[in-house]
């Protein structure tokens, strides 16, 4: 499944400069930060929303408020192949 994560970032250098340790079966094909780094959207391919939530919230700590949802693949356009 594809999962969207939306980020409101208080420390862009730390957030976007960090490295995620992706668990087996999870991919991150798209990262789209705003010009100033204070907002961003990522597309993950993973087994569940909770896997992505635990990964991002665990890595970001208090420097980002995050939202997550599963993409409705039947109505989506342009998902990574």
Task: Label every PLM stretch briefly.
Residues 1-39, 45-57, 62-64, 68-81:
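Short S/T/G/P-rich N-terminal loop/turn motif that feeds into the first structured element of a domain
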């Amino acid at each position: 499944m594809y999962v969207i994560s939306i980020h409101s970032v208080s420390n862009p250098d730390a957030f976007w400069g960090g490295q995620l340790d992706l668990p087996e079966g999870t991919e991150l094909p798209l990262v789209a930060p705003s010009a100033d780094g204070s907002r961003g959207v990522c597309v993950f391919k993973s087994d569940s929303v909770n896997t992505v939530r635990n990964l991002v919230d665990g890595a970001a700590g208090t420097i980002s408020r995050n939202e997550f949802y599963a993409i409705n693949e039947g109505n989506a356009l342009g998902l990574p192949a």
